Design a protein with these regions (language model features):
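Active-site histidine-anchored catalytic micro-motif
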Residues: 2-168
Length: 168
């Protein structure tokens, strides 16, 4: 296996919103999708592999439209790198994975969080770190990393009762 030159092939993180980027803006408001936390999480983790952020959307995944998914697919396909992470809300992550499956010759890993990254007990840091590692070693295709597991994008579902992703 040939190791690519990191400087020539940085990892691109495309952000779409979702719980990973949610915040309370004041004590009276509901969660809202805020500025992406991906850059902060990678800096705190002292990630040295080259990466860059493409902030595409700031939406709850339940609010994503078919047009948003086409825009996501086109944005991911247009990246000059072979490795792309997509931060995404967990409720419709598998729907976006299906749309991204039409992209050939890229390793695409979707991840998100069940609790906002701004919360100390969030799974966001772990999930993003796992996606960052997975995107470097997996062959081209679409994957989802959640709950300490890597799933093929076409062989996973969110079990809302258990609050986790499961094969299927």
């Amino acid at each position: 296996m040939t190791t690519p030159d990191p400087a020539a092939d940085p990892i691109v993180i495309v952000t779409t919103g979702g719980t990973i980027d949610k915040a309370y803006f004041d004590a009276l408001s509901a969660y809202q999708v805020g500025e992406t936390m991906a850059a902060h999480l990678l800096k705190v983790a002292r990630v040295t592999y080259p990466w860059r952020i493409v902030e595409l959307l700031r939406k709850d995944s339940l609010e994503l439209t078919d047009e948003d998914r086409v825009h996501l697919r086109d944005t991911v396909a247009a990246q000059q790198t072979r490795r792309v992470i997509v931060t995404h809300g967990t409720d419709t992550m598998t729907e976006s994975a299906r749309v991204l499956a039409s992209i050939a010759d890229k390793t695409i890993v979707l991840t998100g969080a069940l609790a906002p990254a701004r919360f100390s007990e969030s799974d966001a840091t772990f999930n993003l770190g796992m996606a960052f590692a997975a995107v470097q070693v997996l062959p081209p295709g679409v994957y989802i990393t959640m709950n300490g597991q890597v799933f093929r994008g076409d062989a996973v579902r969110k079990d809302r009762e258990q609050g986790q992703f499961v094969a299927g």
